[in-house]
């Protein structure tokens, strides 16, 4: 089991959205994530979650695992979970995973715990 965490100032994401608008969202989020995230706090939480997940895999966001390789969603109870792109699944076999996202005091934070094997 590997753990990753990330924290980001919500206003940093808000400034990027103000500056780049939909271009920013489309570069880092899936269409489903954009549709689900009505508030900037949610977008910041998704950003932090993707970073935390990549850190748990031990590679961070980059050539091996990109923002679009990780998709964040919520189950029927509102709990967050993630899926990986088909390309990323060629690299990782996930046995179990859990993520938590929270925001307060102007920050969004996420923690990911993932039991996996690398190919």
Swiss-Prot record:
Xref: NCBIfam families: acpS, pantethn_trn
Residues holding Mg(2+): 6, 51
Location of the protein in the cell: Cytoplasm
GO terms under biological process: fatty acid biosynthetic process
Catalytic activity, EC: 2.7.8.7
Xref: HAMAP family: AcpS
Predominant place of localization: cytoplasm
Similarity comment: family membership: Belongs to the P-Pant transferase superfamily. AcpS family.
Primary role: Transfers the 4'-phosphopantetheine moiety from coenzyme A to a Ser of acyl-carrier-protein.
GO-annotated molecular function: holo-[acyl-carrier-protein] synthase activity; magnesium ion binding
Gene Ontology CC: one annotated term: cytoplasm
Pfam families per record: ACPS (PF01648)
Organism expressing this protein natively: Sulfurovum sp. (strain NBC37-1)
The reaction(s) this protein catalyses: apo-[ACP] + CoA = holo-[ACP] + adenosine 3',5'-bisphosphate + H(+)
Disulfides per UniProt: none
Keywords linked to the UniProt accession: Cytoplasm, Fatty acid biosynthesis, Fatty acid metabolism, Lipid biosynthesis, Lipid metabolism, Magnesium, Metal-binding, Transferase
Protein name: Holo-[acyl-carrier-protein] synthase
Enzyme class, broadest EC rank: transferase
Cofactor(s) recorded in Swiss-Prot or TrEMBL: Mg(2+)
